[in-house]
A protein has these predicted regions:
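Conserved, mostly hydrophobic/aromatic
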Residues: 29, 79, 176, 218, ...
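Short, flexible loop/turn elements at secondary-structure junctions
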Residues: 31, 58-60, 70-72, 83, ...
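Short catalytic/ligand-binding loop motif for oxyanion handling, primarily in non-cytosolic enzymes
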Residues: 86-90, 157, 182-184, 224-228, ...
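Substrate-binding/active-site clefts of carbohydrate-active enzymes
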Residues: 139, 177-358, 365-391, 408, ...
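Hydrophobic faces of well-ordered beta-strands that scaffold small-molecule active sites
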Residues: 172-174, 216, 284-286, 361, ...
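Short conserved micro-motifs at the rims of enzyme active sites and ligand-binding pockets
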Residues: 185-188, 408-410, 490-496, 500-501, ...
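Conserved alpha/beta catalytic core and glycan-binding cleft of carbohydrate-active enzymes
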Residues: 372, 378-560, 565, 573-577, ...
Length: 733
């Protein structure tokens, strides 16, 4: 059925997507190899939509455009792309398939998993030859429909206008899942649990504020789908790293009322949540997935980019258009050597920054975004464009500095102003506190303390180079011990091995390099268990891990629930677990309440002491003429570390003395004992500047410091006995 006649679009050709005008909509879609593209206006029930088609003009520089009168917000639509079906040339045009607009601001409906959603012929088992004939069945009733959303004058306050703009040196990141964080929260009304609105509920805000969190980093909230193999097992993609649209919020996280009102209401709910979090002083960072899409490899579904122009949007192996180059482990990788792919990612980032008001982004598998045909480049057009963009360059930009392609591990190699997830920090902390003691218990050697010391000091070996050197500073190191993928902190101390049977892959999925230690017993222990004596040791190990994270130079990232001892029952790859395994449980036993108090106390120490959060890398030189050095290292005997000690793997005890210049020269002494035996430590420092014990990892609750009966103050040269696998923090009295 024909629609109102279209006219050539007069708006700038780079403005892709469907945009509302006074007369109707302007339309533009990028499909350089297509021979024709139609805008399909959809009415009636989604399971049997009536369709009006508008043929777009083009291609001009690969763009297909039109101005279509009479189309209003709320209109459902999609595209159909015409062209050759020649899989050997990478051309997979099939106009029987309704395609999702990559620029859609809203989506309704669910992706189906029948044969109709495939471009090539497949059987009921969804298996077929991707190089075989095109499938003639229409997919309009089996795919989500894009929805026209008017973003010209949005209701409510502007979330981009009240950004907290927390400096990196004061930033504490809290990585959370939109649903999982609040789905079981007892203080939220049922209708808000697991929603965008729930994130901004006063109970959630109060928890984040009391903890000391300054930035809430959300796992993907771009519209996403579940992989067919998960659906066949009755599972879903819980994390959301399977993007269907880079602009539309994932509607399932909205309240039922917003979903019923439509995509505009979903967008309003997201913006309102961001604004409310800003009012509370909390920034919002988004985990964004531009490296691949939900379409999988060539045997996968045909719902958007593959149908618009498979040969253009995706990387191809060795330049052979028939084969996809998978550097992401998902079956496909977007090709960031293409101007249009770079433009799509930039437009999406600007939309979420300017319209939704978020404060930054964590880029999943960011190396893919910096890949040219000859590999990763720190001066890649995408990275330069983000860094220099007036809407983006001043935001918090965090790279996951790897992908699975050749030369894909690039920690420390992203340009300013990017910060990076520091996997070397994670590995060093886990090794020192868990893997090494586990080995030592069996008479095996561990790592030298220099690795942990380097991470405590901000990882200058990774982030101190560049032109000019030392430009980024220690804040570029996003330090973490756990993240969404892998064991939780409580599971790191309770499991030697992953327990992923619930994922339906015979425990083959998930990493085997966990550097965990179960303290002699696999899994949970109860008070009446014969192994109950390992429980306090595990709790101490959690405190050691958390303290090392929070007290290190750099930007700490906490995984939601670690502050209250969340467990995933040993599952270290809970990407498909939308249920109790992954959700945060808010019922606090005594030890979990103590862990929360400890987390709050440690983060308060970080906040109160500039020596723990330096702007620049430590130099080991005086903070001023005649003053103390900004960093010094000492052994258990109180003598300074020399070259030999750094290389002696038998040494497991050290002291780290840090000083921040100021009127009182803020000083913090960290004393670490990673040995399996108690060690007497001669405290470092100046004789005329006594210490106060601010925290001891032996304390189940930080309040024990006031009731321990020990001396409240200590002087340099005094001897303190550190119990096995423990640490202390001293501040000036």
């Amino acid at each position: 059925v024909s629609a109102p006649p279209a006219t050539p679009s007069a708006r700038p050709p780079h403005r892709l997507g469907v945009h509302v005008t006074d007369a109707g909509v302007d339309v533009a879609v990028l499909a350089p190899h297509a021979t024709a593209v139609e805008l399909c206006l959809l009415d009636g029930p989604p399971e049997a939509p009536a369709e009006r088609r508008v043929r777009l003009d083009g291609p001009e520089l690969g763009l297909w455009t039109a101005s279509v009168p009479g189309v209003r917000p709320g209109q459902r639509y999609g595209f159909r792309a015409h062209g050759p079906w020649e899989p050997a040339r990478g051309l997979r045009f099939n106009p029987a398939k309704l395609l999702v607009d990559p620029y859609a601001r809203g989506l309704v409906g669910e992706l189906g998993y029948g044969p109709e959603t495939y471009g090539h012929v497949v059987g009921d088992d969804l298996v077929g030859d991707p190089y075989g004939p095109a499938d003639p069945r229409d997919s309009a009733a089996h795919v989500p429909h894009a929805v026209v959303v008017d973003t010209r004058a949005l209701p409510g306050p502007d979330p981009a206008a009240n950004r907290p703009r927390t400096p990196w040196s004061r930033t504490v990141v809290y990585e959370a899942h939109t649903k999982g964080l609040t789905h079981l929260h007892p203080d939220l009304p049922p209708e808000l649990r697991g929603t965008y609105a729930g994130l901004a509920h006063p109970a959630v805000v109060a928890h984040l504020q009391s903890l000391g969190v300054t930035a809430l980093e959300l796992l993907p909230v771009h519209a996403f789908t579940s992989e067919p193999h998960l659906v066949a097992k009755g599972l879903t993609n819980y994390w959301g790293y399977s993007t269907l649209g880079f602009f539309a919020p994932h509607a399932a996280y909205a309240t039922a009322a917003a979903r019923a009102a439509g995509p505009a209401a979903v967008l309003d709910e997201v913006r309102a949540a961001v604004h409310a979090l800003h009012e509370a002083g909390i920034e919002v960072l988004l985990d964004v997935v531009y490296n691949h899409t939900c379409e999988g490899g060539l045997p996968g579904q045909h719902v958007a980019w593959r149908g618009l122009d498979n040969a253009y949007y995706y990387r191809h192996l060795g330049g052979v258009p028939a084969a996809l180059d998978d550097v992401t482990g998902t079956g496909n990788s977007l090709d960031f050597s293409r101007t249009g792919v770079v433009a799509t990612a930039l437009d999406s980032l600007r939309y979420w920054a300017d319209v939704v008001g978020v404060d930054g982004f964590r880029f999943d598998l960011a190396v893919t975004l910096g890949r040219s045909h000859d590999g990763y480049r720190a001066d890649h057009a995408m990275l330069v464009a983000v860094a220099s963009d007036p809407s983006l360059g001043h935001l918090k930009l965090v790279a996951e500095p790897w992908d699975v392609g050749l030369g894909g591990w690039r920690t420390g190699q992203f340009p300013p102003p990017f910060a990076e997830w520091n996997d070397r920090f994670r590995n060093a902390v886990r090794s020192f506190w868990l893997a090494d003691p586990g080995r030592a218990a069996h008479g095996l050697p561990g790592h030298r303390v220099r690795d942990l010391a380097t991470r405590l000091a901000g990882s200058v070996d990774l982030f101190g180079h560049g032109t000019p050197p030392l430009l980024r500073g220690p804040q570029a190191s996003v330090n973490y011990v756990t993240a969404h993928d892998g064991f939780t902190m409580a599971d790191l101390v309770a499991y030697d091995h992953k327990h992923n049977a619930a994922n339906g892959e015979q425990n083959r999925d998930g990493s085997d390099d966990n550097r965990s230690w179960n303290h002699g017993v696999e899994g949970p222990v109860t008070p009446d268990s014969p192994a109950a004596d390992v429980a306090p040791l595990r709790r101490r190990s959690i405190r050691n891990l958390f303290a090392t994270l929070v007290l290190s130079a750099g930007t700490p990232m906490i995984t939601a629930g670690d502050e209250i001892g969340r467990t995933q029952q040993g599952n270290n790859n809970a990407y498909c677990q939308d249920g109790p395994i992954s959700w945060v449980h808010w019922d606090l036993s005594d030890w979990r309440a103590n862990q929360l108090a400890t987390a709050r106390h440690l983060l308060a120490l970080r906040r109160e002491h500039p020596a723990l959060r330096p702007h620049r890398f430590y130099s080991g030189t005086p903070v001023r003429e005649g003053g103390p050095r900004d960093l010094a290292w000492y052994g258990a005997d109180g003598a300074e570390f020399d070259h030999g000690r750094w290389h002696d793997a038998s040494i497991r005890t050290f002291q780290m003395l840090r000083v921040a210049p100021g009127t009182q020269d803020d000083r913090v002494l960290l004393v670490v004992n990673g040995a399996l035996a108690a060690v007497d430590v001669t405290l470092a420092g100046d004789a005329d500047r006594p210490w106060r014990l601010a925290w001891d990892s032996l304390w189940e609750h930080p309040g024990e410091g006031a009731t321990s009966g020990g001396p409240p103050h200590a002087a340099a040269g005094d001897v303190a006995t550190l119990e096995p696998l423990s640490m202390r923090v001293y501040v000036l009295a």
